[in-house]
Amino acid sequence: MLTTRKALYYLDKGKTKKAIRLLETCWKQEVTTENKRDIFTATVLLSDVLYQSGEHFPEIYQQLMSILEEMQDLEAVEFEREKAKQIFAELDEYFSEVGTFFQGDSLAELWLEFDYENDYKDVYPTPQRVAAIEAELGYKLPKSYIYLMRHTQNGGIVSTGSVPTTEPSSWSENCVAITGIMGIGNQGISALNGMHNTNFWIEEWGYPDVGLAIADCPSAGHDMVFLDYRNCGKTGEPAVVHIDQEADYKIMKLADNFEAFILSLYREEY
């Protein structure tokens, strides 16, 4: 158990990378009667750390499949066994939903690496974290929104930042521009329930209460993109709208749903 205890010490001190490097050595060891328990507990701990970070899902899946089959008879590790089963089940769900939304390579060039992308990003949205944020917000998030954040990255700056429109806005005659999409969480400043959340835009900037703010624009707050729940209720499938403060908070529909909104994004050529 020495490896696991040392890794827990590193994690408690915020030294996650050291803990991961230490625990990874267990994946490479040959299992014996003497080390079986230590390898099992270390593998489960490492799997949990990586899963919570949204990393190395195929490797975790294979490792958990292996140890769950080999160590059913191992005593005194019931907690770890149940944790392993939980992670394995959630990864099974993750892999089974691949391709549900955004067919083809439509997301290949969505995100842009930028200095302040972390304002929008948050920790990996496990099902438990998604449920907690939905409870905080009081809205059910679109499945395609959750899918995007789980299968690409949880918020950030977009490279394809133009959205076509059929009417003019304060930005352009035929499009609006967005800067970043808010990740699911409450740690990033511009995450869905971070400091610059929907309540901030409603209370401080006067935006109408139509649902959830999900993306900001280059105008630094003078126009925003929202999920519009007015017609579907807080648990329904919301439309995506643009709200223009410079035009007396004019509301313009951009897409029937979030998936259609993402698929409509393109890179403006100047």
Residue ranges of model-derived segments:
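Amphipathic alpha-helical segments of tetratricopeptide repeats
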Residues: 27-28, 65-69
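A surface-exposed partner-binding patch
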Residues: 86-219, 269
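Structural signature of alpha-solenoid helical repeat junctions
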Residues: 38, 56, 76, 80-83
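TPR-repeat structural position
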Residues: 16, 56-57
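Primarily a tetratricopeptide repeat
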Residues: 21, 59-62, 66
